[in-house]
């Protein structure tokens, strides 16, 4: 099992964070995969989550001899469709709840696209509070867990750097991600791909769940829509995801 920090993340320098692009993230992952192959002499199973899954699909397309399979958890596939789905979800939830505070937050967020950190984080807060990121956890609970984990890993000063870098990367990547569309130029993989989606994930349309596995070329493919799970399916239903990883 190998973990790594993407370029600009964690305690990296500001220069590293400012150099991030989607293409650079793909190239970095390809370099890591080659390094793992050279070090271990084995092919690897790539486990990617959200945008990380999208990056994995792009990287593995070009490294077929290094990778055994890909597990893609809630991959970002089409930003325009996803943003429209989320906006519609917010409108529906606001009308159903008849909650002035929720309505105010939705109105303040406005229509997509969300190309700055404040809007992106505001949307993330709403998604979490409405139960579509992790079941049973609101934004504050997820934020607390994340901060505690960062402090354990980086210490206080390191966490401050990591949070700074998070904002820098968002500012750099968000405008670029508006045009993200895997359907327009789908990856062509030579290894099996296993897609996992959460049934309560407002970011992923049902049409994307159906279309993505059919669009991306691969010698074998599975796709599962997991009940009682949001965007972070691996946290909500770890046993299901573990069983997929074991057999991948």
Regions found by a protein language model. Give the residues of each.
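Conserved acidic catalytic loop of the alpha/beta-hydrolase fold
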Residues: 24-44
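Short beta-strand/loop motif that positions the catalytic acidic residue
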Residues: 189, 195-197, 201
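Catalytic histidine-centered segment of alpha/beta-hydrolase-like enzymes
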Residues: 229-238, 242
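Alpha/beta-hydrolase
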Residues: 97-184, 191
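Conserved alpha/beta-hydrolase
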Residues: 1-13
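Conserved hydrolase catalytic core segment
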Residues: 42-81
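A catalytic-pocket lid/entrance helix-loop region that shapes and gates access to the active site
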Residues: 67-112
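Conserved alpha/beta-hydrolase "acid-adjacent" motif
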Residues: 202-208
